[in-house]
């Protein structure tokens, strides 16, 4: 937490483009005080990997099962090359009904790699909802 590794290393290492100093300052702003960085330590530990932690893995699994049968409109923003949602997971998402898919350039924090394309896609998708 002392080094603010999530903001200083994980974030810039997970984008295709180099964030500007102004952008980095915005990410740093809420975490200037080391004690305020606790969420950046806790949250990654809650990401389910190989079924652990089980409570979170169960929630994710139940939600994925629901999305696979729900007719609720969905917008799938596929990132190329992507980072986490690739391979089998990407293919699974593509099977969901009533879904629009777009492709943008991006790795993990895709809003930083393709902000305008994502904003335009979300706006158009929302306008086309019936």
Regions found by a protein language model. Name each.
Residues 1-47, 54:
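Helix-rich cap/lid subdomain of alpha/beta-hydrolase
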Residues 9, 26, 42, 62, ...:
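Alpha-helical elements of Rossmann-like donor-binding domains used by nucleotide-donor carbohydrate transfer enzymes
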Residues 29, 79, 104-106:
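Active-site donor-binding loop signature of nucleotide-sugar glycosyltransferases
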Residues 32, 68, 127-130:
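Residue-level signal for alpha-helix termini/capping positions
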Residues 97-130:
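Catalytic active-site module of serine/aspartate enzymes centered on a nucleophile-bearing elbow/loop
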């Amino acid at each position: 937490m002392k080094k603010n590794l999530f903001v200083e290393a994980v974030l810039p290492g997970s984008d295709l483009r180099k964030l500007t100093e102004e952008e980095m300052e915005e990410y740093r702003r809420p975490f200037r005080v080391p004690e305020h960085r606790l969420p950046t330590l806790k949250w990654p530990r809650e990401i389910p990997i190989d079924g652990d932690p089980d409570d979170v893995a169960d929630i994710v699994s139940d939600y994925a099962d629901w999305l696979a049968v729900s007719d609720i409109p969905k917008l799938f923003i596929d990132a190329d090359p992507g980072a986490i949602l690739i391979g089998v997971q990407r293919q699974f998402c593509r099977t969901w009904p009533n879904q629009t898919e777009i492709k943008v350039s991006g790795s993990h924090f895709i809003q930083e790699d393709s902000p305008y394309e994502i904003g335009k896609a979300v706006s158009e998708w929302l306008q086309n909802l019936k």
